Regions:
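Class I SAM-dependent methyltransferase core
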Residues: 171
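Non-catalytic, mostly N-terminal accessory regions of nucleic-acid modification and defense proteins
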Residues: 1-165
Length: 171
């Protein structure tokens, strides 16, 4: 089993923590996107793009309701950032998590995963995210509510149509 598949399974397993909190799979994927962005900035030594005091380690070093309230404020502050990319990622961001203990558990689990094994592999993090989107799509009414297009089909359509730069293909 590849490390990406293993990590996707672990991340998807964490969704069960939030299911009882009323968080849908689609909301979980969005929540995970925010947390993984913060974690990977830390892992890659790119924390400097984030405002001081609003970085992964600042979040990890808090627990319970203090962490929960900080996370909510953090999402707002990052959405108000003057940095174009941060603002676009976090604009109008909010958390769907209601219980502070669930956020703490999720952050602890994410922090304990072995990211080094996949981050430098070809397609590593992109494949990880694609795996999560696929699982979300497969959840039917509770998930994305749409069909997930398998990578093999996407590659075949691209190969057969031979799109030029700037052209768009819809599936």
């Amino acid at each position: 089993m590849s490390k990406q598949i293993d990590i996707v399974k672990k991340l998807w397993g964490f969704a069960k923590i939030l299911k009882d909190d009323g968080v849908t799979y689609l909301q979980y994927t969005t929540e995970l996107t925010y947390l993984l962005f913060l974690k990977m900035n830390n892992e890659l030594g790119k924390d400097k793009i984030l405002p001081k005091n609003y970085r992964w380690n600042d979040l990890v070093n808090k627990t319970g309701s203090t962490q929960y309230n900080f996370y909510r404020k953090m999402l707002i502050e990052l959405g108000l950032s003057k940095d174009f990319y941060l603002q676009n990622i976090f604009l109008n961001a909010s958390t769907s998590i209601r219980e502070p203990k669930n956020l703490t558990t999720l952050i602890t689990n994410i922090n304990n995963l072995d990211w080094y094994s996949i981050k430098n592999k070809e397609g590593g993090l992109a494949d990880l995210y694609e795996g999560l989107v696929e699982k979300t799509g497969n959840e039917g009414k509770k998930g994305a509510g749409q069909y997930y297009t398998p990578r093999a089909l996407i590659n075949m359509v691209i190969r057969l149509t031979g799109p030029k730069l700037g052209e768009v293909i819809s599936d």
